[in-house]
Swiss-Prot record:
Enzyme class: ligase
Pathway of action: Purine metabolism; IMP biosynthesis via de novo pathway; 5-amino-1-(5-phospho-D-ribosyl)imidazole-4-carboxamide from 5-amino-1-(5-phospho-D-ribosyl)imidazole-4-carboxylate: step 1/2
Keyword Metal-binding belongs to the record: no
Family in the record: Belongs to the SAICAR synthetase family.
Pfam family, one: SAICAR_synt
PANTHER family on file: PHOSPHORIBOSYLAMINOIMIDAZOLE-SUCCINOCARBOXAMIDE SYNTHASE
Record's protein name: Phosphoribosylaminoimidazole-succinocarboxamide synthase
GO terms for biological process, alphabetical: 'de novo' IMP biosynthetic process
Key words, A-Z: ATP-binding, Ligase, Nucleotide-binding, Purine biosynthesis
This protein's GO CC annotations: cytoplasm
Coiled-coil parts of chain: none
Reaction equations catalysed: 5-amino-1-(5-phospho-D-ribosyl)imidazole-4-carboxylate + L-aspartate + ATP = (2S)-2-[5-amino-1-(5-phospho-beta-D-ribosyl)imidazole-4-carboxamido]succinate + ADP + phosphate + 2 H(+)
EC number: 6.3.2.6
Length: 367
């Protein structure tokens, strides 16, 4: 079988029964189930949600995005083998660990296939919850330009690149474009301070002000759980992005949960510990791919300058990346996933047909 056949690139054309448009993101597609199918699954599977809760099928692809663009490889390899399976396996592992340690639930109700989640519809908090343990990446670039205040927090002089910070920093940004919030620019992914959030509790979609403390607590505790677990494999949890939302349980009680994905190579930086001690940075995350892109193209400003998005999209669509680069990404993702979960990943030879078969035979969701 051709290597490209093992990659799930298009994930928004599955014959899943739905009466709403399929939502397609950079990597995941969401199929909202009909009221009848949601109610049937809640009853038949015993999900801990209200009987009338909306459910969705979330299918992850093997596409690779960076700098807000989706990138493709040569020889028809338009995704990264095993990437989606690795991301879901890692998130599943951390979500279970969070729950086992009494932190909070996630939006995932069922895992029919390594590339598929059944999820409960959540009301998202409009914050990208970012935690940083080291100064690197965009934060370091800003620091070298003289910035010392990040999201209302002042950091000390004299820090060096890739140095561990004195304490874990919470540097949130907006999730999407928020309008009408005094002091918050109307643009995507804008840094905000704790005081910004406190001034606009409802604007950021929090139910009450005390949940600002709760989200920070869950972010810090989740970060520590992952950091401690990775340290056992001599891996360093550098920084990460979490997302939060609200759902109701079967009794109708509202709760704040983790959602999207957590602790993955897409949403986090992970460094190899032994290399870091030797003064070298070996990325075990998508950051390695970002650095490759910056070094590969003669004008890296296109990838960094948000005023050059038209050029950036053209760059991504006009350039097929070497197959060896796509396989390097695959090895990084699959390798770190297998370290985290402690076993080999099963990567499907025909993922699309597998998904259809399972959702038809075990969930009666295929039309």
């Amino acid at each position: 079988m051709n290597l490209a056949d093992k990659v799930l690139v298009v994930n928004d054309n599955l014959p899943i029964r739905t009466d709403k448009p399929v939502h397609s993101g950079k990597v995941r597609s969401v199929y909202w189930l009909t009221e009848e199918d949601s109610a049937r699954l809640i009853k038949d599977k015993g999900y801990d949600v209200p009987a009338d809760a909306p459910l969705a099928i979330m299918v992850i692809s093997d596409r690779i995005s960076a700098f807000d663009c989706v990138w493709q490889g040569e020889n028809g390899l338009n995704g990264v083998p095993g990437k989606g399976t690795a991301l879901n396996a890692i998130s599943n592992h951390w979500f279970k660990l969070f729950k086992d340690k009494g932190l909070a639930d996630s939006h995932i109700l069922d895992i029919p296939h390594p590339l598929v989640w059944i999820v409960q519809k959540a009301r998202p908090v409009m914050i990208e919850a970012i935690a940083r343990q080291y100064i690197t990446g965009s934060m370091w670039r800003s620091y070298t330009k003289g910035e010392r205040e990040f999201c209302g927090i002042t950091i000390p002089e004299g820090l060096e690149k890739d140095q561990k910070l004195p304490e874990l920093l919470i540097t949130p940004s907006t999730k999407g474009v928020l309008t009408g919030l005094e002091g918050v620019p109307e643009a995507d992914d804008v840094n905000v301070s704790r005081s910004d959030i406190e001034r606009h509790v409802k604007g950021f979609n929090f139910s009450n002000e005390s949940d600002i403390d709760l989200y920070e607590k869950l972010l810090k505790e989740g970060f520590d759980v992952i950091s401690d677990a990775l340290a056992e494999h001599d891996q360093i949890f550098v920084d990460t992005k979490f997302e939060f939302g609200y759902v109701n349980d079967a009794a109708g009680n509202e709760k704040l949960i983790y959602m999207d994905e957590v602790g993955t190579p897409d949403s986090s930086r992970i460094w190899d510990g032994s290399s870091h001690r030797d003064g070298k940075i070996i990325e075990q995350s998508k950051e390695g791919f970002r650095q490759w892109l910056l070094n590969h193209f003669p004008d890296p400003d296109i990838l960094l300058n948000k005023n050059r998005m038209v050029e950036r999209f053209a760059l991504a669509s006009d350039n097929k990346l070497p197959e060896s680069v796509m396989m390097d990404i695959s090895n990084t993702y699959v390798g770190i996933a297998e370290k985290i979960i402690g076993k080999k990943l099963h990567i499907s030879d025909n993922p699309k047909q597998e998904i259809i078969d399972i959702l038809r035979d075990e969930y009666q969701l295929i039309v």
